[in-house]
């Protein structure tokens, strides 16, 4: 949200796009570090013990925790599972979150300004990042399987949203299935088919915004009788 706010406040002509973007990322990192420390101190000051490690259920009342130094079991009457979610990455040839291919979590750490950005997925996450980076000055292209923007919304509403993004300079490729992704040191090469025709797109960076999945893979929920 901080980066989005900075993008919409970008002053005209006072600073180069790449310089303003880099400054925004650095300020965001400083703010996150400060808030994390404040939140941690507030938690431990309220008689809460914090253990950093990998947790999994042994049974419905026992949680095993493996830290860098030791392993222990914690018994509890109740467990509140608050492990959040992580980005879902579809099984596409060559699609790995590394170098110039990002999720919404890693793109925000990108210090190098992307002059061109391709986004896979036109959901809320994809649209938010498209608007943010278009405001920063990037040339953004969104690739999506649907035949139009926001297919679950009324057509007239979706059309107005579509027009607002076109006004930002965002391009769209609809009815698209990505078959392969290649990347090198300077760009990402995206291969797709749309309406029976093959297409290709190159961009400096590629954001995968295809939804999220719960972080429960390591919890061994079945040991606690929890179905996921």
Label each residue range with its predicted role.
Residues 1-113, 146-150, 156-157, 164-168, ...:
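Glycine-rich flavin
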Residues 111-153:
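Rossmann-like NAD(P)H-binding beta-loop-alpha module
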Residues 96-100, 136, 159, 223-226:
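Glycine-rich, phosphate-binding/catalytic loops in enzymes
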Residues 80, 117-120, 133, 140, ...:
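Hydrophobic packing within well-folded, soluble alpha/beta domains
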Residues 50-52, 142, 172-174:
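A structural preference for short, hydrophobic beta-strand core positions in alpha/beta folds
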């Amino acid at each position: 949200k901080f980066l989005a706010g900075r993008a919409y406040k970008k002053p005209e002509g006072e600073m180069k796009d790449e310089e303003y973007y880099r400054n925004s990322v650095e300020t965001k990192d400083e703010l996150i570090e400060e808030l994390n420390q404040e939140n941690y101190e507030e938690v431990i000051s309220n008689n809460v013990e914090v253990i950093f490690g990998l947790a999994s259920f042994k049974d419905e009342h026992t949680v095993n925790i493996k830290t860098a130094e030791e392993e222990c079991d914690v018994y509890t009457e109740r467990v509140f599972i608050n492990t959040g979610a992580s980005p879902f990455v579809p099984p596409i040839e060559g699609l790995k979150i590394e170098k110039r291919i990002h999720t919404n979590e890693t793109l925000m750490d990108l210090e190098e300004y992307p002059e061109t950005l391709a986004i896979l997925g036109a959901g809320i996450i994809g649209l938010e990042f498209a608007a943010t980076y278009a405001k920063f000055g990037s040339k953004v292209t969104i690739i999506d399987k649907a035949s139009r923007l926001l297919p679950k919304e009324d057509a007239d509403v979706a059309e107005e949203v579509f027009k607002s993004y076109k006004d930002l300079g965002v391009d769209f490729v609809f009815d698209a299935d990505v078959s392969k992704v290649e990347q090198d040191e300077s760009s990402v090469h995206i291969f797709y088919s749309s309406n029976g025709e093959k297409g290709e797109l190159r961009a400096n960076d590629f954001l995968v915004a295809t939804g999220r999945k719960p972080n429960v893979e390591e919890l061994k929920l079945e040991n606690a009788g929890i179905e996921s």
